Amino acid sequence: MLKNAPYKFSEFESMSIQYGNCDSLVNKYDSKTGDYQYLNRADSLVKMKLHLSKDDLLYLHRKAADLGFWDFPVDETGDSVKAGAKQPVRYIIEFKYQRKSKKVVFDTNFDGDIRLIDANLGVIKEINQVLNKVEGDQKK
């Protein structure tokens, strides 16, 4: 099955995630450059270089495959003008490979299949866990 997968890790180039309010995606990570920035609990912008190992990237590649990321719709945005709606958090996740790439835009107020929403949240959770682990290891 893995040999016929449309996205092969041997062709992997980079992974990136951006998230925040729809008008300002201030939280960002790019595995190609190692640029990582996020708002901490004190609302201060933290910037650093954070390089993921090949094993970390392989783990994320496999988790994305397990959760069905390659089959996610490209546009999973919610209704941002709904009366009384809280502004959603927008996530832009992209995996780049030599021959193709997959980019998904997901809003937390996306009104789709609950399984798809859970799968998106699963990919986001896995990426954040890896980033937090590597950042914690780097501080030691």
What kind of feature is each model-predicted range?
Residues 1-54:
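N-terminal export/targeting and maturation segments
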Residues 1-19, 77-140:
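Short, well-ordered, aromatic-rich surface patches in folded extracellular/luminal domains
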Residues 33, 52-55, 106-113:
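A short, sequence-level motif marking secondary-structure junctions
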Residues 42, 56, 64, 97-99, ...:
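A mature extracytoplasmic/lumenal domain signature
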Residues 47-82:
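Mature extracytoplasmic domains of secretory-pathway proteins
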